[in-house]
Structures are given as C-alpha cells and as structure tokens.
C-alpha cells in the first residue's frame, strides 16, 4: 500500500470516527436548560444583605435558587436591580455554580443570568453533562427562552460511539 493511498485511508477513517464528535459539538441540544418566567422563584441561603447604594442584594452560603425544574446552586448570588428600581437586571453567581434542569447539568466557577434576554453565561472550567455525554470548555452561553447555546474555549467532549 503506497503512502498516498494509506494517507487517504487514514484521513477517511479519522473523518468517519470523528463525525459523532462534530455532531455533538455542533448540535448540542440545550432544550432541557429552559426557564419559564411565569413560574415563582424560590431562594434559600444562609444569609441575605441589601445594599441600597449599589441597588443590589446578595445571598450568601449554600445558595439555592429554583424556578420550575431549573435549579441554580452557588456559594454566593448577587442580584442587581434595574436602574429604575423595578425588576431585576441580572443575577451573578460565584463559588461552585451548578445549573441543573432535567437531565442537563452545567457547572462552572461563575455564572451571569441576564433577565431581559434570558441568557446565562457560565465561565471558568465549564462542564456540561447531558445524560451520558459530557462537554467542557471555558465559556458556556445558553439562551433559556429557546434552548440554544454554544460552548467555547478549548472544547473537549466525551461520547459513546453509536449513542446520543
């Protein structure tokens, strides 16, 4: 077998074996990570502090926020209110952040949830698991209203060949 033929065979084999990886990275279904803004939000924490000067409030110590079947846990969550004082602008979670909904879970060092766009950005050693599949990177951005998202920053995935 000549070098060009062996090279073509190796390239074809690599492409065939890598196809599930490309499919997984390009078509991640974030459908499980969705929020229904009409459902009540429940927050539990060890402590709560309000800062009128910065128009914010901070929950600290084993913070757990739930809305429907979506749960966010973290060491600390700061809520920044809108400038007009009506409504929440964003939530910033830090300290071992875990976002879970159904069979989907994402963990990271920090997370920012922009309320008006329903976008969550997780940063720092992100790991997303969906069933038996896992994908990691440095940044995960998920739109909770439509379930779309992307992961960036040296993306690595683990999958079972022939499975989803």
What do these predicted ranges mean?
Residues 1-164:
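Mature-chain termini and adjacent capping regions
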């Amino acid at each position: 077998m000549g070098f060009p033929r062996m090279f073509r065979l190796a390239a074809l084999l690599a492409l065939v074996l890598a196809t599930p990886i490309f499919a997984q990275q390009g078509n991640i279904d974030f459908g499980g990570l969705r929020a229904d803004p009409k459902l009540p939000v429940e927050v539990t924490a060890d402590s709560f502090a309000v800062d009128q000067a910065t128009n914010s409030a901070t929950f600290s110590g084993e913070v757990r926020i739930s809305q429907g079947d979506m749960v966010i846990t973290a060491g600390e969550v700061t809520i920044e209110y809108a400038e007009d004082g009506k409504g929440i602008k964003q939530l910033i979670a830090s300290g071992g952040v875990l976002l879970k909904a159904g069979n989907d879970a994402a963990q990271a060092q920090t997370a920012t949830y922009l309320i008006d766009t329903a976008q969550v950005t997780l940063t720092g050693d992100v790991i997303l698991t969906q069933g038996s599949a896992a994908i990691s990177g440095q940044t995960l951005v998920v739109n909770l209203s439509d379930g779309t998202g992307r992961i960036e920053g040296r993306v690595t995935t683990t999958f079972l060949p022939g499975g989803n």
